[in-house]
């Protein structure tokens, strides 16, 4: 099923980047439906198709082609939107398409959340969708926040509790929080006859907690923690380092935790 990501405003603004699908190509220009503005179309004059000379417009645009264009003029009274394909850098074009695709995914999430409440997508937009876009910048940002921080983060922003609950449920089911990796170091020394075994035991205590241990050069060892929660990763790193140090110190050795090397 195709999802049309919507904007709160009925018409785009001048200077805005829009995504369109070309549906008609003529000798003097092309028409494209605006994917984010239901029922609206834009006109691309042949002079705005490419920065180079355009002998045949069909060498640059074709029916059903997805395009990114910059809005030049908007006339709601006449129903006209004029856009340019040439007044965009390639990196802007790429970012816009990527953002649009992500928002398509978020709109699917919104529909799933609405379904859990027995509502349709139109109702979802009116009751909470546009509000989420105002608060978080876009729909996906709202679902990402819900996945990472829970429904309380939505409720605190004024999102109704019933919507916050289903949005969070859908978000946690479909979005994996990005993984972070943090690194710390322990310098541990043992003066006991069985010092090697003591050091090995200390480092194994960190490995048993799921931490990667790497030798930098005795007496220094690198501890690496991976997690989807930065604060939990920091806590895990410090606790593991402290445990290593305690094991060594208990046997008459010494140790030090270094969060960063200077």
Curated annotation (Swiss-Prot):
Q: Can you give the residue ranges of the S1 motif domain?
A: 15-86
> Which Pfam families has this protein been placed in?
EIF_2_alpha, S1
- For the keyword Lyase, the answer is no
Name of this chain's protein: Translation initiation factor 2 subunit alpha
Q: Which NCBIfam families match?
A: PRK03987.1-1, PRK03987.1-4
Family that this chain belongs to: Belongs to the eIF-2-alpha family.
- InterPro entries, alphabetically? NA-bd_OB-fold, S1_domain, S1_IF2_alpha, TIF2_asu_arc, TIF2_asu_C, TIF2_asu_middle_sf, TIF_2_asu
Q: Per UniProt, which keywords does this protein have? A: Initiation factor, Protein biosynthesis, RNA-binding
